[in-house]
C-alpha cells in the first residue's frame, strides 16, 4: 500500500491546545455557555484559535506553530486576554485544572456541531463524562518515520508528563486520592491507550488504511491514543497532560517535552521493542495515582525507580538540548517544582484544606488562571 502523506515540519516545532473550564461567577459551577461565548468572539482577533469542545462548559485555545516556548507563551497571554475581556461582557470566568471538583457530568450539554452530535450518538454517556480538561502538545517531525519513532520513544516518559501536569485530585464532589483523576477517564473509549507496535510510517499507513476500510475510523481524530501522529500537521500529539492552573505551567511542560523530543530524535537512545508497552499501563497508573511520588518500572533496570528521580536525571541528561532551544528558564523552574514534589494537584489539595470549600477552591483556581495575565478584572468572593 502507498504511504499516507506526512506534512514535513521543522524538527521539534511546537504547538499546544488548552481546554479550560467555563465557570458561573455566582455559583462557581461549570456553566454551559460556550455557544454564547463563541458568538461573542465572532469578530475578535484570534477567533479561529478559540474553539468549542464536545460539551458546552468547555472552551479550547490553540496556539499557532512556534520554535520558541517564549513566543508561544506570549501568544497564549494574548489569547487569554481576549477570553478575559469577552468573559467580562457575559459574566462568566475561566479556570485551569484537569477536572471541576463538584460538577455532575449528567448535567452537561453537547455542543451542537455536526461532529460533536455524531460523537455523542456514537459514545453516548462517555461523551458527557469526558467533561475534563487537558493540554495537548504538538511536536514537529521532519518525516513520518520520525513521528513513529517519537510516538513510541515518548511512551517511556508518559509518567513524567502525567506527574508534572497532574491537577485533578477532585472529581464529582469527592477526593479521588489520585493526583490525576482525569487521566483515567478516557480508558473506556475504543482506540484509547497506546498506538499498536508499528515500527515505521509504512506499517502505520497500512494499519490506518485497514482501519478505514473496515469502517472503524473515519480520520485520525478517531484514535484516542495517549500519543498519536498527526500527519496533516506534521506532528505527534501528546494528550496525557491535565490542563495546568496557569499558562506559565503549560509552558514549563511544553519546554520540557520539546527538549526531550529533540534529544530523542537526535540521539535515538530508546530502543523500540514490545517491552516498552509491557510496563506502560502500570507506570501510567503510578503517575496518575501518586504523581511525582510514584514509581516507574524501566525495562533495563531490576527494580522500580521514583518518577521524581527519573525526571531530574532526564533533565540533566538533556541539558545540551535545553540550552540549544533556549528553554533554560522554564526547565530550571520545572526542576525546582519536581525536586520539591510540587505539582498543581498538591497545590489544589493545599488550597482545599484551607477552607474545606469547593466553591472557594474554584474561585482560587480562577484567580490563579489570571495570575500571569495582564488583565485581572474578574474576581469573585464566594460566601
UniProtKB/Swiss-Prot annotation:
Keyword Ligase included in the entry's annotation: yes
UniProt-listed InterPro entries: GCL_type2/YbdK_subfam (IPR050141), GCS2 (IPR006336), Gln_synth/guanido_kin_cat_dom (IPR014746), YbdK (IPR011793)
Keywords attached to this entry: ATP-binding, Ligase, Nucleotide-binding
Group of enzyme by EC: ligase
Single GO term (MF): glutamate-cysteine ligase activity
Biological process, per Gene Ontology: modified amino acid biosynthetic process
EC number: 6.3.2.2
Catalytic activity, reaction form: L-cysteine + L-glutamate + ATP = gamma-L-glutamyl-L-cysteine + ADP + phosphate + H(+)
SUPFAM superfamilies (UniProt xref): Glutamine synthetase/guanido kinase
Record HAMAP family: Glu_cys_ligase_2
Family note: Belongs to the glutamate--cysteine ligase type 2 family. YbdK subfamily.
Physiological role: ATP-dependent carboxylate-amine ligase which exhibits weak glutamate--cysteine ligase activity.
The protein's name: Putative glutamate--cysteine ligase 2-2
Organism for this UniProt entry: Legionella pneumophila (strain Lens)
Amino acid at each position: 500500500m502507498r504511504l499516507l502523506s506526512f506534512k514535513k515540519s521543522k524538527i521539534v516545532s511546537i504547538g499546544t491546545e488548552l481546554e479550560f473550564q467555563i465557570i458561573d461567577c455566582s455559583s462557581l459551577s461549570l456553566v454551559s455557555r460556550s455557544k454564547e461565548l463563541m458568538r461573542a468572539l465572532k469578530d475578535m482577533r484570534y477567533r479561529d484559535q478559540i474553539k468549542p469542545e464536545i460539551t458546552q462548559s468547555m472552551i479550547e485555545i490553540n496556539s499557532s506553530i512556534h520554535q520558541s516556548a517564549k513566543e508561544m507563551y506570549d501568544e497564549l497571554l494574548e489569547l487569554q486576554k481576549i477570553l478575559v475581556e469577552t468573559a467580562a461582557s457575559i459574566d462568566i470566568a475561566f479556570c485551569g485544572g484537569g477536572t471541576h471538583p463538584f460538577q455532575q457530568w449528567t448535567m452537561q450539554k453537547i455542543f451542537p456541531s455536526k461532529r460533536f452530535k455524531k460523537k455523542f450518538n456514537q459514545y453516548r454517556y462517555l461523551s458527557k463524562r469526558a467533561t475534563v480538561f487537558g493540554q495537548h502538545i504538538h511536536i514537529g517531525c521532519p518525516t513520518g518515520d520520525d513521528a513513529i519513532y517519537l510516538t513510541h520513544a515518548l511512551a517511556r516518559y508518559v509518567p513524567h508528563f502525567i506527574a508534572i501536569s497532574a491537577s485533578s485530585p477532585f472529581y464529582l464532589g469527592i477526593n479521588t486520592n489520585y493526583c490525576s483523576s482525569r487521566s483515567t477517564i478516557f480508558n473506556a473509549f475504543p482506540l484509547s491507550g497506546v498506538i499498536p507496535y508499528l515500527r515505521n510510517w509504512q506499517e502505520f499507513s497500512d494499519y490506518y488504511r485497514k482501519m478505514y476500510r473496515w469502517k472503524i475510523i473515519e480520520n485520525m481524530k478517531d484514535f484516542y491514543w495517549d500519543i498519536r501522529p498527526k500527519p496533516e500537521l506534521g506532528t505527534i500529539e501528546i494528550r496525557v497532560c491535565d490542563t495546568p492552573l496557569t499558562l506559565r505551567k503549560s509552558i514549563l511542560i511544553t519546554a520540557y517535552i520539546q527538549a526531550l523530543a529533540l534529544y530523542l530524535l537526535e540521539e535515538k537512545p530508546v530502543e523500540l521493542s514490545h517491552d516498552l508497552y509491557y510496563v506502560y499501563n502500570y507506570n501510567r497508573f503510578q503517575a496518575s495515582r501518586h504523581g511525582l511520588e510514584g514509581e516507574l518500572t524501566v525495562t533495563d533496570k531490576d527494580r522500580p525507580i521514583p518518577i521524581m528521580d527519573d525526571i531530574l536525571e532526564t533533565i540533566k541528561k538533556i541539558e545540551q538540548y535545553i540550552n540549544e532551544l533556549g528553554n533554560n528558564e522554564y526547565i530550571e523552574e520545572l526542576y525546582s517544582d519536581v525536586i520539591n514534589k510540587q505539582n498543581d494537584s498538591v497545590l489544589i489539595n493545599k488550597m482545599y484544606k484551607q477552607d474545606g470549600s469547593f466553591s472557594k477552591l474554584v474561585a482560587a483556581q480562577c484567580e490563579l488562571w489570571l495570575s500571569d495575565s495582564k488583565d485581572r478584572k474578574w474576581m469573585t468572593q464566594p460566601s
